[in-house]
Structures are given as C-alpha cells and as structure tokens.
Amino acid sequence: MNFDVVIIGGGLAGLTCGIALQTQGKQCVIINNGQAAIDFSSGSLDLLGQLPSGRQIQHFEQNYTALYQQAAQHPYALVGKDKVIEKARQFEQLAQTLNLGLVGTCDKNHFRVTPLGGLRPTWLSPNSVPIVTNEEMFPHRKIAVLGIEGYHDFQPQLLAENLVQHAQFAHCEVTTGYLNIPELDHLRHQSREFRSVNIAQLLEHKLAFSDLVREIREAVNGASAVFLPACFGLETQEFFSALKQATQLELFELPTLPPSLLGMRQHKQLTQHFKQLGGLMMNGDKVIAADVHHQRVTQVYTQLHQEIPIQAKDVVLASGSFFSKGLVAEFEKIREPIFALDLVENDRFNLQDRMTWTHSRFSAPQPYQQTGVVIDEHCRARKSGQFFENLYAIGNIVGGFNGIELGCGSGVAIVTALVAAEQIGGEK
C-alpha cells in the first residue's frame, strides 16, 4: 500500500493535519486505534489560558513573549508567534467551512461555563455553550438549570451556587429543577448505562418530542435562559437546535462527565470531512514498527497488516500522550513505543530519575505531563540527537508543555498539525 502521507492517530491533530493535506491534493491514510481524547473533551478548544507563572491571560499575542521566557520548550516558542496566530486563524476559517458551529477568535479569549459553575478561559466554543467575556454581563437575568432525574453526571444545585459567585452572573436569578422524561425509565434501573451517550441514543429514537418540549417549558419557571446537560443530539446539533426552536427558549448545553457528546460531534464532523476529501481511515489498527533509512521513514507495519508494509513519502505521528498510549511509562523509563524518539527533559524533569516525574501534591501540575517528543520549528521529530527528514510529530505526543495546566492542548494540536501540513505540502 502506497500513500503520500501516513498519519498515525485519528484525534484532533491527526484529522486536522489530514484535512489540510487532502485539501492540498495529498493522498493520506489515518491509522487509528480506539477512541481519541477529543471524544472526552468539553467541545471547547483552548489556545492558551494561562502562563506557567499561573497568571490567567486574555490576549495571546500580548502574552507570547512572557510564554517564551517562561517556557522556552513550548511548541509555540519553537514555531514562533506569527506562525501560531496564522495557523489559529487558518483553523477558524476551516471551522467555518465545515460548519462546526464554533464561536470565538484567537485575538481574545472568552469564558465558557463549566459543569460545576466555574468560568474557564478558552479560544473557541460550540455556539450552544454559554459564554461570556471578562467585561460583559450574561444577557439573561433569569436562568433555569435543569438536570435529568437519576442522572448523576450533572448537578444543577452545585452549578447554580457556584455560577452566581462570578461577576458576570451576579445579577442573575438562578433556579434549578429536573426533567423526568419517562422514556428514560429503562436506563434509570441500570445506573451503569445512564450516561450521556445512552441518553442521547434513546431520545433520538424513542422520544415523544412534544412531551419533552412541554416538560422543559413547564420546568423553567419563567426563565428566559435554560442550562441543560449535553445529552440531546448524538452525532449532530440538529436535535438540540430543534428543541431550542420548539421551546422558544434560549437553551444552552453544558458538557458532562466523559464521554462528551460535544467532543464526539466534532470528531464525527472532522472524520466525515476527511473521508469526503478522499482520505482513508484504517480504524481498529495500530502501527507497531517502522523501517528507517538515513533519517527517513520508508514504511510502517501495523498490527493487522504485519506482512504488508505501508509506504509513504511522509509520516505524521499524532498518537497522543499517555492516555492514548502514544507515550508509555514503565517503572524506570518513559518511551515513545514506535520510533524510540527523543523525549523532552528539563531541570525539573529527568527521564532517568523517577522521583522527578511527579509532584508530591496531587493537585499540582505533574512534571511528567510536560514530557513528549522533541521537535523543531517544522515539527520534525528527533531521534538520537538528529531530526528526521520526513517524520513529523504533532499534538499531545509533542513535549514541552502541560496542556491541562496552561489550557493549550487543543491549540497545540491544531497549530502543530497545520505547521506540519504546510511543511509537507511545500515539499517538492
């Protein structure tokens, strides 16, 4: 099997890179094993939420120098400010083209409401999610937060109590309630199955829609805005939009405990577009080995096609971090399992000293979360001190940052994906 580009990993980074390359006329295959982190995400995409010093930021461009000074190994520091902004804006255009329904701009962060009633800075959010800026008040004075009876992954009272602590919601009257939805009685008797995905599947196929509309309208107690758990609409936002139109209320949905319908919808849309452009998905398979000759990967072998190598001019590693097994931690070492690539170290994290991998305080940023593959400004991966000519690393497999701490995981995935795609597309 021969392709222009083999992409290892089908998450946000892999799909974004694949779409960009297919648009340039490259023939790509994505080798994907299992679910990606995007399936468990909030649906909002972060560019940079705070600096390593802990200071929350609003404007990326104004704070880039501080990021560079505090985290010189960060992928943004390697790529450069202008390139990061260019690629962020490129993705904003792509999101519009694909009708992803995202709002926001890389010029300034906004705040999304979290399931616990907090406010988290972010770059792009689904248009169905409640958002505010630092300066504005939420436009609705009366808010109803409605859960679903027996569904424990969304707590209306806790959300309501925390929400009014923020200046943007201090003027709001927030009430809480629960929807019964009799069609869900079967799931209520099986608590393990009472999750957002199962609820959405059941509602789309067996729901008396008019009864749900009536129940919501009766539960809001005169509120003009309604916050609901993201359990309405499995693969698209069409069901939720229809519900909003039928109730004639400003309905908003909030992400629940994983898996997240908001992230799964995005994954579905990106995958469909990649396929529509002519890309091939090899699902349920994984790369286990590769042939390398003079700093070039010539072919890769997968678990299901060990006797049939897959050849490509370029290879993109988008296999994720520990969660997706793109990185593997053993008792005495952390390694990248396919190519044995060099991993990022610093004065606080030593691959040879396990005691430096973690912080004694559980809630503190953990040093091991910053490790990952060493790349250059073009996202080429390094092994034994030398950079490959045609192997690129993108997304959470890349080292030098803690996406949870800094609020930049999605941004790094998107920016590195588009930088690698540009580099590959420009090759002769």
Curated annotation (Swiss-Prot):
Pathway: Polyol metabolism; glycerol degradation via glycerol kinase pathway; glycerone phosphate from sn-glycerol 3-phosphate (anaerobic route): step 1/1. Its EC number is 1.1.5.3. It catalyses: a quinone + sn-glycerol 3-phosphate = dihydroxyacetone phosphate + a quinol. InterPro entries: FAD-dep_OxRdtase_2_FAD-bd (IPR003953), FAD-oxidoreductase_2 (IPR050315), FAD/NAD-bd_sf (IPR036188), G3P_DH_GlpB_su (IPR009158). GO terms for molecular function: glycerol-3-phosphate dehydrogenase (quinone) activity. NCBIfam families: glycerol3P_GlpB, PRK05329.1-1, PRK05329.1-2, PRK05329.1-3, PRK05329.1-4. Belongs to the anaerobic G-3-P dehydrogenase subunit B family. Conversion of glycerol 3-phosphate to dihydroxyacetone. Uses fumarate or nitrate as electron acceptor. This is Anaerobic glycerol-3-phosphate dehydrogenase subunit B. The gene is glpB.
